[in-house]
């Protein structure tokens, strides 16, 4: 399997499966002198962790501590410039829950495509295709966030919609301490009620996550094929559940006239930010704004129609422990992916002068 490394200068390579001994990765290309220790990475992992407070009733019953162990690349609290290795053990996997799936393909999952490509698949939770894989992204993204902080660049992410119920973005700064990473305290009860009802129906929910980066200098991004917005879209779409990405006004731009969509240029910046902080694939100094649409988790507690590995029709009811709504755990993942892109682009710009 190829495609396990992300980035050009600041590179993250990940390994591990949902029901293997553990997951981890190596960050290569991080400069020396970045303040970093296990607590810095752990803080981000705790935001994504199964059973975290942000997920509430929406989360999986699988309770992984997600304790990170740094293996290399850090000495006396700073990076050394050498590869940064880390490992996170799987401690609460229950592979016996998946025995019935050995000969059945789960609708909405990558079972059938992995089988088509490799001639085999890990039916214990999906292996590399599991959302569990994203724990390594969050750990690698924490290193990127530490580097960006040295340059006064901040990345944050929050939920703007669950199950078709939108939030008003009134307090994005407080979203991290709120259920569902909501920027709107008033919408939380409606989301809780929706999750409760959908759980009772044996179904799942999707939603939309917004990622913002402030302090990004003008000039990041490499036309023509490595535009900053193209790289961010690549990063977001590489997350298994993401099905669409918008930048700035996004889909709404199709409904605007040019006179409405253009951001007037004024002394010191721009009057509006429909461009989402990127023009011509290059950052313009405005906040970067990206939204990702996340599909409902396909593991549902309802009977579904599928086929077995011999192509015969078969009913399926998925067991195991799964999220009702993965949005709260996707939020830190998308934040991490944006950080990886920005750290890589920043280092590339510095190298090119």
Swiss-Prot record:
Keywords, comma-separated and alphabetical: Amino-acid biosynthesis, Aromatic amino acid biosynthesis, FAD, Flavoprotein, FMN, Lyase, NADP
Q: What does the record give under GO molecular function?
A: chorismate synthase activity; FMN binding
For activity, the cofactor(s) needed are:
FMNH2
Q: Which GO terms describe its biological process?
A: amino acid biosynthetic process; aromatic amino acid family biosynthetic process; chorismate biosynthetic process
Source organism, top-level taxon:
Bacteria
So, what pathway does this thing act in?
A: Metabolic intermediate biosynthesis; chorismate biosynthesis; chorismate from D-erythrose 4-phosphate and phosphoenolpyruvate: step 7/7
Subunit structure of this chain's protein? Homotetramer.
Q: What is this protein called?
A: Chorismate synthase
- Specify the taxonomic lineage: Bacteria, Pseudomonadati, Thermodesulfobacteriota, Desulfovibrionia, Desulfovibrionales
